[in-house]
Amino acid sequence: MFLRSFLCLLCLLPSILYCADLEIHVRAESSLLPVNVSLLSSPKDTKQGSYLASLRDLFARDLALGDLLAPTKEIAPLTVFIEASYPELIFSIKKDGKGAQKIFSLELSGNPSKDHQSIHEAADRIHFLLTHTPGISSGKIIFSLCSTNSSEELKQGELWSVDYDGQHLAPLTNEHSLSVTPAWMHISHIPAYIYVSYKLGVPKIFLNTLSQPTGKKILAMQGNQFMPAFSPKTKLLAFISDRDGNPDLFVQSFSLATGAIGTPKKLLNEAFGTQGNPSFSPDGTRLVFVSNKDGTPRIYQMQIYPEQHPPRLLTKKYRNSSCPTWSPDGKKIAFCSVIKGVRQICVYDLASGRDEQLTTSAEHKESPSWAADSNHLVYSAGSSSTSELFLLSLITKKSRKIVIGSGEKRFPCWGAFPSQHIKKAS
């Protein structure tokens, strides 16, 4: 239980599609925009026809995921055409009875996993064009899939990836150890991530990509290392280490090409108590983190770049908080807080200074992580021995379970990467 309690206590946007003649926006607070999704195809056989229809349905579900669009097969002022000339799919948009405008195309491979990812990317492109809000279906969620022994202490957990709908579950590590708190590095198109592994006997920070089963230790620093976070803007790695006895917050200059640069810098002294859960602002100049200097864990914000400023308390409403995470748009911070004995997901609005409780169910929630649109979160929920992943919409205030299978699913992190399979229409 100590490991889990300690981790709890301390615990990429799609490329912009420009279309000069097509200006269609909806706002998050508006009603859903109906969008007819039509498949135009002449399949050579029933099997191919069924496959194309399944891709059309997946595309529609992807569009609906953002809670701004309402895909339909009925007539609507706005239509997205998917013209199938197998293996090519051409995507066009028709508005208010005007001529359809070709946007882009993609080529199917016949491999369901690859084709589904291509459809996710296509849906996210269309979603951005129609709403000016990033689509989130193509993002990958990485998490730790763990087992327990009779004492309920986490003993082994490999890292896995999964789509938002629970499909295409895939192992990332094969280290026969405990791996926790994975975090995407959000470096352009490179699917690199950092995480903590116990494979050396003590927790150390490792770097890996989706193509490798084992990671590489990135710091020579003594002591245990926990909860890494990386800013691609300032090229700073933030993490927690007990090198000097107390779990303290450190930053380290880091390059994906050359590794650690210089020596780690401790940001605060022992007077700030136990520190944990660092998360960078999108521009990399500020951190939010947890400290128990006042007796209970609370969330603080601090500028660290280009010069360091003193920390300040972020929220006074909740006194037992953890796991802060900065939204991609920089406007909100999601976090966990114990409310009436249950750890719930909350969000703090930086402009208004207001807190909002987002969940109310009886399960303890942990490790919120933002989707690229800053309107959705993934988090884990359960008990000391069971844990599942859930998606939460800030628009609808509803959660839904990601159905994956057995085992404890913890420490989710939602990443997004530029499209790899889309070609602009000529």
Swiss-Prot record:
Pfam families: PD40. Transmembrane segments: none annotated. The keyword Cytoplasm does not apply. It is found in: Periplasm. Keywords: Periplasm, Signal. Residues 1-19 form the signal peptide. The keyword rRNA-binding does not apply. Its main location: periplasm. It comes from the Bacteria. One of its GO terms (cellular component) is periplasmic space. PANTHER family: PROTEIN TOLB, PROTEIN TOLB HOMOLOG. Belongs to the TolB family. This is Protein TolB homolog. The lineage of its organism: Bacteria, Pseudomonadati, Chlamydiota, Chlamydiia, Chlamydiales.
